[in-house]
Every structure is written in structure tokens, then in C-alpha cells.
């Protein structure tokens, strides 16, 4: 196959989206944008990106940020392990590299939360190093370009695709080339629905287009079944209109975040909820059920039963705090898993 870079780059320079991390592709900006975009659409991530940079304009500021403020800045993006790893990496960068990301692929790859793709994106876009940056968009483009039925989630197949990506990469324009492939996958060689082949600069070279197989590609491994878990959520409110929050363990699902009272693995009745509250030293003065809800994590699906409970004034149990509606809005971060109950909390 002839080299795709000339046609691809010509298309990219004419059609690329104007994005703040392209206008200023400094290492910190590219890093932050790539972490945010791992599980979030560009349009949804941009307001968070701007707000985050306004609050934490450089790596030392990120490294020094208090945990609750950091979580609040990330609130709404979900997958909070991303921002925890971001801060861990920032602290290492401050300790080992003087607060500046290293211009070295392997050193970037060694930082928490930075995998092959993110290291490649930073190294090629910010430091102009000739390395690959292969994400799902790029794998889809090359799967169709070569009409390759390989399962792209398999490491050996991904390595083979990466080698093909590098065969076409112009070393002097590695960052633009990598971004152009990602942009082509995001805007033209799209994942859902028919690819927009009539807009594609590589259409004349695309083997899947000729074979009529573009809609069938790429091939992925079948996803693992999620575990269904019953959960009981309790919005306990005292006479001062404060809600009881508990902090999750520092490791595991939603690590370190705040949540309403929660019992995992159990769908409790109203009587059982009152008994549990009384065991915590909280008098149950009134209880009403809330609509059932569910939340899907990557490997678990919570089926939530909810209750709104009025309780007598008391000290917060160990690991819990009382929070006013104002504090809930400005200080504490509740994960999106509790979206169905946030209106009741005044959020």
C-alpha cells in the first residue's frame, strides 16, 4: 500500500477541530486532555478541561492540590482513578523531573496512569518524537484500511497494527500524523453506524471499502458479563437539614469518595434500614422509599433501592460526616453513580 501520510495530513490541516490543547500543545495540556478523553467525549470534556486548568495551571499546582478540591474539579467526569493517578504522576514529576514532564517515551510510560497510547500522544505531539499513539480510533482506521479481521483487543494484533502505523509515519511530522489518524477515526471512520467514506482522504486505498466489509470491522473480543449487585442507598437527613455522608475505602471501587449511607450486596426493607440506622446510633423518625435506580460500572451493575429517612440529631458515626446542602454543592464530591438521588440532596 502506498504511504497514506500525504493525503491524511492534507485532510487534517484542512478539517481538524480547533481545540485548546491543539492551540497550545504543551506537555501538561496534552497530558490532561488525553486523560480526560479516555472515557469522555471531546464536547463533554472541554468545560472540565478549561475549569481544571484555571484552578491548577501547572504540574506543581496539581501535585499540591488537596484531595477534596481535586475530586470536586473532576466531579461529573467519573472514573476517579484517572485523576488520582494524574496527581500521583504529578508528584513524581515534581520530585524527579523538576515539575516538567520528561521528553522521553519510556519515562512517560513509567508514570502512574500513563499507558502506551498516552505516552505516545505526549511524546509525539508535545516533544515531536517519532513514536506511535495508537488508540481505538487508530485501530479502527487500520482495521478497515487493510480489511484486517484481527481481534484488535488482542495484544499481538495491536502490536501488528502499531507496526503498520509506524510504516506510514513521517518522523518529522509524527505528532500531526498521530493526531490526524485519531481525528479521522473520530470524525469520518466512525465507530457507530456507517463510516463516512465519501469524506475520507484514504477511501481510494481502503481495502474494506472495496470489499464492502467496513461495517463489520474492527473485530473485538466479546465483553465479559457484568456482575449484578443489589445495593441499598439511604439519604439520612437530620433536623438541621444535613445529610449523612460516608467515605469509601481508599482502595477499590470509587476509592476515597463520599457517598450517602450505603449497604452493598443487600436490598434492605424499610424495617431493616431502620434497624441498621439504630445500630449506628441514629433514631429513625420517618422513612419513605425512593425510586429504584441502577448504575453501570465497567464490571459491576448496581441495582439500587433507595430510602429517604428522617433521623434524630446525633453525632456522625465513625467514617461519616454531616453535610449541609451548601457543603454538598461546594465541598464534597458525590460520584455519578448516585445521580438518581442528587435532586433529593439539593444537587
List where the protein language model places each region.
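Intrinsically disordered, low-complexity, charged terminal extensions of DNA damage-control enzymes
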Residues: 1-18, 23, 186-347
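Catalytic cores of DNA base-excision repair glycosylases
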Residues: 2-198, 202-211, 215, 283, ...
Amino acid at each position: 500500500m502506498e504511504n497514506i501520510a500525504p493525503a491524511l495530513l492534507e485532510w487534517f490541516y484542512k478539517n481538524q477541530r480547533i481545540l485548546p490543547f491543539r492551540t497550545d500543545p504543551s506537555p501538561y495540556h496534552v497530558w490532561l486532555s488525553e486523560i480526560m478523553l479516555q472515557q469522555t467525549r471531546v464536547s463533554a470534556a472541554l468545560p472540565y478541561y478549561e475549569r481544571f486548568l484555571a484552578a491548577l495551571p501547572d504540574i506543581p499546582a496539581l501535585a499540591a492540590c488537596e484531595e477534596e478540591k481535586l475530586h470536586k474539579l473532576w466531579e461529573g467526569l467519573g472514573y476517579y482513578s484517572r485523576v488520582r493517578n494524574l496527581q500521583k504522576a504529578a508528584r513524581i514529576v515534581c520530585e524527579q523531573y523538576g515539575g516538567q514532564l520528561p521528553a522521553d517515551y519510556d519515562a512517560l510510560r513509567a508514570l502512574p496512569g500513563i499507558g502506551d497510547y498516552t505516552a505516545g500522544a505526549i511524546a509525539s505531539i508535545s516533544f515531536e518524537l517519532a513514536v506511535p499513539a495508537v488508540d481505538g480510533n487508530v485501530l479502527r482506521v487500520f482495521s478497515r484500511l487493510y480489511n484486517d479481521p484481527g481481534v484488535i483487543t488482542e495484544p499481538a494484533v495491536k502490536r501488528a497494527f502499531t507496526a503498520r502505523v509506524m510504516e506510514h509515519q513521517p518522523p518529522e511530522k509524527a505528532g500531526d500524523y498521530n493526531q490526524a489518524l485519531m481525528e479521522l477515526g473520530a470524525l469520518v471512520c466512525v465507530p457507530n453506524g456507517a463510516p463516512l467514506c465519501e469524506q475520507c482522504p484514504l477511501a481510494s486505498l481502503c481495502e474494506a471499502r472495496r470489499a464492502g466489509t467496513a461495517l463489520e470491522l474492527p473485530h473485538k473480543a466479546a465483553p465479559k458479563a457484568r456482575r449484578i449487585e443489589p445495593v441499598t442507598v439511604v439519604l439520612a437527613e437530620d433536623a438541621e437539614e444535613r445529610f449523612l455522608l460516608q467515605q469509601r475505602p481508599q482502595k477499590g471501587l470509587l476509592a476515597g469518595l463520599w457517598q450517602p449511607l450505603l449497604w452493598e450486596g443487600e436490598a434492605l426493607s424499610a424495617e431493616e434500614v431502620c434497624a441498621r440506622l439504630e445500630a449506628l446510633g441514629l433514631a429513625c423518625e420517618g422513612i419513605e422509599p425512593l425510586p429504584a435506580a441502577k448504575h453501570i460500572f465497567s464490571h459491576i451493575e448496581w441495582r439500587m433501592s433507595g430510602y429517604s429517612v428522617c433521623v434524630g440529631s446525633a453525632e456522625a458515626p465513625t467514617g461519616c460526616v454531616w453535610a449541609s446542602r451548601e457543603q454538598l454543592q461546594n465541598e464534597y464530591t458525590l460520584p455519578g453513580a448516585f445521580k438518581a438521588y442528587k435532586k433529593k440532596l439539593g444537587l
